[in-house]
């Protein structure tokens, strides 16, 4: 069992009882997205910097389906606070940049959003960037449906975070 050593310096990486690195250090070794960002999976990173990374969704719901994730482990959208608004905004901007690099200029035919817990398959914050929405199939339209209790747009998430005390 791990003990909490009060004399340990603040720079010590905390390790959970099962030996996993704590998400406090920015990496969860059981998280597939942490592995992708750290280039352990062979997934092509379309963008990667200290703050955010972007790669293609493994099961695309639209001709262009990208995931934008924080480069350090951050829990799902339900765990966010008001201080995460700039991160979410930066994730949306990166999604727009990736779409533009792929010649998607009609931003009226795109969707930016998150699955709301418990309907997210990976509990590392990830923004779905889908385009063109008009070419999404029936199942994808349901899976990424606006005004559903399982999917929230980036704009709705920012409004929700702004309303927190």
Question: What does each of the following model-derived ranges do?
Answer:
Residues 1-165:
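HIT superfamily nucleotide-processing domains
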């Amino acid at each position: 069992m791990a003990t909490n050593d009060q004399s340990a310096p603040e720079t010590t990486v905390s390790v959970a009882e099962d030996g996993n690195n704590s998400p406090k250090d920015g990496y969860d070794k059981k998280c597939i997205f942490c592995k992708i960002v750290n280039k352990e999976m062979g997934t092509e990173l379309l963008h990667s910097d200290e703050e955010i990374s972007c790669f293609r969704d493994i099961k695309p719901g639209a001709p262009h389906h990208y995931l934008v994730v924080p480069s350090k482990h951050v829990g799902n959208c339900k765990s966010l606070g008001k201080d995460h608004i700039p991160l979410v905004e930066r994730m949306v901007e990166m999604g727009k940049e990736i779409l533009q690099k792929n010649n998607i200029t009609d931003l009226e035919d795109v969707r930016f959003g998150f699955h709301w817990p418990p309907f997210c398959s990976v509990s590392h914050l990830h923004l779905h960037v889908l385009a063109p929405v008009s070419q999404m199939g029936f199942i994808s339209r349901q899976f990424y449906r606006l005004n559903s209790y399982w999917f929230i747009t980036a704009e709705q998430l920012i409004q929700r975070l702004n309303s927190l005390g």
